[in-house]
């Protein structure tokens, strides 16, 4: 089996994670005690992806729950599925990270990291064929961002060839939970660029908009928002868990979505999203799902795909449908909106079809897009970071934990590089003489052509000139 070990870090990660396990357990017919009460063999066929079978036919999630303070853990334990988790897999400190990335990454988090890695190792050892890890965390706080990224880099050292997929809640443009969010997020992105394989970017503001405008919820709670995130999380792995006509997994996803190693930050979406009142008035068809899936209002991060171009995208359909129709719709979307797709990657939408729809729906689709528009998100954080860092505001909280200003400067320039890489590929055309090199100036390009010129015409002089 292709197992996935799930890790949730910090308050946000644990709340998303708790909701995710409710959704997944429901799909597989597992009740809050871990017993199976489903009605189809398909629910059990590949249940090992996310669950361990324990004695007495109980199913235990392959989940590791991490936090630097006990509060959220207690709420997860007291929640609807709190008793399903293995008690040893709750790893928590007492002090908290106080929204400070340095505490999570270097001091408090570093003290707890070995206990977490022991639990992760135990989970990985109980797998037949571990496919990878998925981590739910936020980038704005202290634990999820600081300790979450520390955990990612440690796991990457120990399991370099396994997939590392993160569901990262990024700071919202208008709604801010903490003042030092831009610092924490920039330092985290600096780590994620190097150590993660796939980063699904989610932000609360976009989730609020979806709940408010599309789902018509007047006062959406975090529970409602987390439900949206878990719909995407379950959609990404449904092909691993249920039989399908066209399968996909974390590695196939990465191979099809990431044209250049650093550009692995994705926009995610889900369809159908309709308010309870209007469910009866809409038909669920593949064209309808496709149209909604590419709608900017459906994106779970505040980046508008119309402001950039898709390098690649992936659509994971669920339910009984014809693969021919799926292929036609994908082609149709690309032909009609060709200006929003880069022309130097032909057929850049990957699709997969899984036969089992989510609970309560006839068909659904999960969308993952690698769009250059995601640079808006990084630009926003970067501007806020620069404004504070120029005045060295709040810096003493970080340097007090042993951090160096240099690390901030490096993180800032890494993020700015990322933005300009996205911009570069957004502007690139099929005829560009890019040669695949990333940071190549015009002068170097000219010099290179001159070299070719010499090689072509005067082979004997060539050696002298190049030296």
Curated annotation (Swiss-Prot):
GTP binds at residues 11, 69, 138, 142-144, 204, 226. Residues 429-444 have a biased composition (Acidic residues). Its cofactor is Mg(2+). Pfam families: Tubulin, Tubulin_C. The keyword Magnesium applies. InterPro entries: Beta-tubulin_BS (IPR013838), Beta_tubulin (IPR002453), Tub_FtsZ_C (IPR008280), Tubulin (IPR000217), Tubulin/FtsZ-like_C (IPR037103), Tubulin/FtsZ_2-layer-sand-dom (IPR018316), Tubulin/FtsZ_GTPase_sf (IPR036525), Tubulin_C (IPR023123). GO terms for molecular function: GTP binding; GTPase activity; metal ion binding; structural constituent of cytoskeleton. Its main location: cytoplasm. Residues 429-448 are annotated as: Disordered. One of its GO terms (biological process) is microtubule-based process. Dimer of alpha and beta chains. A typical microtubule is a hollow water-filled tube with an outer diameter of 25 nm and an inner diameter of 15 nM. Alpha-beta heterodimers associate head-to-tail to form protofilaments running lengthwise along the microtubule wall with the beta-tubulin subunit facing the microtubule plus end conferring a structural polarity. Microtubules usually have 13 protofilaments but different protofilament numbers can be found in some organisms and specialized cells. Tubulin is the major constituent of microtubules, a cylinder consisting of laterally associated linear protofilaments composed of alpha- and beta-tubulin heterodimers. Microtubules grow by the addition of GTP-tubulin dimers to the microtubule end, where a stabilizing cap forms. Below the cap, tubulin dimers are in GDP-bound state, owing to GTPase activity of alpha-tubulin. This is Tubulin beta-1 chain. It comes from Physarum polycephalum (Slime mold). The lineage of its organism: Eukaryota, Amoebozoa, Evosea, Eumycetozoa, Myxogastria.
């Amino acid at each position: 089996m292709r197992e996935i070990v799930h890790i949730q870090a910090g308050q946000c990660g644990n709340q998303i994670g708790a909701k995710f396990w409710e959704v997944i357990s429901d799909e597989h017919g597992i009740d809050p005690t871990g017993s199976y009460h489903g009605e189809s063999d398909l629910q059990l066929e590949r249940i090992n992806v996310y669950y361990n079978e324990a004695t007495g036919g109980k199913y235990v999630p392959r989940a590791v729950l991490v936090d630097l303070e006990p509060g959220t853990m207690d709420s997860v334990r007291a929640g609807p599925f709190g008793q399903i988790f293995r008690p040893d897999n709750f790893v928590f400190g007492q002090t908290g990270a106080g929204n400070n990335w340095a505490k999570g990454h270097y001091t408090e988090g570093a003290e707890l990291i070995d206990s977490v890695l022991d639990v992760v190792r135990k989970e990985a050892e109980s797998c037949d064929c571990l496919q990878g890890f998925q981590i739910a965390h936020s980038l704005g706080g202290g634990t999820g961002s600081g300790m979450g990224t520390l955990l990612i880099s440690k796991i990457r050292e120990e399991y370099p060839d396994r997939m590392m997929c993160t569901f990262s809640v990024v700071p919202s443009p208008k709604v801010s939970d903490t003042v030092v969010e831009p610092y924490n997020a920039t330092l985290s992105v600096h780590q994620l660029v190097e150590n993660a394989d796939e980063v699904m970017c989610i932000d609360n503001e976009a989730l609020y908009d979806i709940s408010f405008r599309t789902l018509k919820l007047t006062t959406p709670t975090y529970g409602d928002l987390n439900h949206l995130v878990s719909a995407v999380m379950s959609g990404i792995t449904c092909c691993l868990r249920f039989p399908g006509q066209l399968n996909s997994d974390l590695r196939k996803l990465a191979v099809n979505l990431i044209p250049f190693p650093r550009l692995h930050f994705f926009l995610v979406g889900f369809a159908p999203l309709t308010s309870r009142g209007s469910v009866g008035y809409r038909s669920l068809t593949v064209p309808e799902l496709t149209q909604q899936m590419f709608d900017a209002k459906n994106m779970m991060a505040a980046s508008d795909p119309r402001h950039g171009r898709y390098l690649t995208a992936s659509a994971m359909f669920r339910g009984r449908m014809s693969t021919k129709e799926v292929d036609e719709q994908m082609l149709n979307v690309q032909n009609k909106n060709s200006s929003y797709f880069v022309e130097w990657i032909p057929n850049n939408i990957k699709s997969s079809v899984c036969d089992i729809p989510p609970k309560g729906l006839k068909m659904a689709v999960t969308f993952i897009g690698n769009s250059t528009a995601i640079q808006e998100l990084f630009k926003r954080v970067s501007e806020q970071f620069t404004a504070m860092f120029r005045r060295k505001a709040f810096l003493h909280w970080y340097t007090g934990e042993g951090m160096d200003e240099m690390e901030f400067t490096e993180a800032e320039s890494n993020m700015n590089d990322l933005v300009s890489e996205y911009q570069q590929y957004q502007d690139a055309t099929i005829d560009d003489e890019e040669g695949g090199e990333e940071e190549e100036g015009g002068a170097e390009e000219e010099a290179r052509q001159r070299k070719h010129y010499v090689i072509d015409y005067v082979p004997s002089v060539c050696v002298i000139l190049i030296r």
